[in-house]
Amino acid sequence: MTLAIDMVGTNLGSGTKTYNINFCEYLNKRNLNERIYIFITETYKEEINDKKNKNITYIIKSKFLANIFFRIIWMQFFLPFELIKLKVSRLSSPMNFSPVILKFFNIKLILALHSNLPWVFFKQMSGNLLRNYFTKFIMEISIFVCDKLIVDSKFAKDEIVNL
């Protein structure tokens, strides 16, 4: 079973960027038994201390995908077909949302949700109101279509169960 990980994210100094880079560096040091494709932006690739791991293939995406709008378009309409082409059987999406049509392609989805801000403190989300509602909407759909959901706390789990 081939795994892909969608680590395409913001270029801004943030917890998301730090998480993505550290996660990639962690995987680079592991003795892996299966092939993993990791989708990242050019900026992340420049910052990853790339210890050549024969089982990891980085698929470098343009810096313009650091923009949330373009990232969602790519994720929903292009990423699923890239996964099919690579014969991926599982996608790990650790950035709160994922392609919602993967079920149609028989690709298992592992979603990691590291923010429950849209349900608990919606008004404290950064960005404009329309973007925040759209983000919350995509996150909710991703939760409903995923095969496995990973949350970072019991509090977050309790909030998600109530959706």
Regions found by a protein language model. Give the residues of each.
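Carbohydrate transferase catalytic cores enriched for Leloir-type hexosyltransferases
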Residues: M1-L163
